Amino acid sequence: MITFDNVNKYYGDYHALSGINEHVAKGEVLVVCGPSGSGKSTLIRTINRLEAIASGRITVAGQDIHAPGLDLNAFRSHIGFVFQQFNLFPHLSVLDNCTLAPQRLRGLTRREAEERALALLERVGLAHKARAMPAALSGGQQQRVAIARALAMQPPLMLFDEPTSALDPEMVGEVLQVMRDLAQGGMTMVCVTHEMGFARDVADRVWFMDHGQVLERATPEDFFARPQHARAQQFLSDIRSPFGVPA
């Protein structure tokens, strides 16, 4: 599904991504973790060209995403992206937030778009809020609407960039449950997150990043029980609860 071939990215003299050579399989749930400033968010944003790379090659579903003549808007319409901030259109209702893009970019009729949106809002537990405005929702509810809005385009790939980091602690669980349900449905997902419990329970693989490199790639079982790289060992030691369970 996604291949990184010797990908490099710089911010001035800072080497933000250093020689990334990795692959994400179709249907895989990948969690990317690591300390702040490790390159996690930069990496995920290169997948739909929100961040430009300095060198290397990225392919998504066999498409070189830097190929000349690529219709970037059309390409991005096939990738769902959920950010730290919810980025809902404040002047549109929940339902209209979820129907706008399918009508404009997929050619759905208003009725078709609403039927799809209402089914997705039901899936994330918010069908009863379809007529509400974003300002009337909690942070967790807004993020669930953002997920439903992304899914309304029926993307084969979903990207999550720390989707719970801006939420109050009591709202995190409701968003993670929606993500768990997506993972169980076979969606290809790349998730940048500090939610290690989610990584342990849901991910097929974990990448650990530091200083712009993927230092470790492993199953959750191996990563949490038997981390190989010293930096990964230190990271897990720093985030473990007093009871020795990943936070």
Where do the model's predicted regions map?
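ABC family nucleotide-binding domain
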Residues: 1-220
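C-terminal boundary and immediately downstream tail of ABC-type ATPase nucleotide-binding domains
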Residues: 217, 221-247
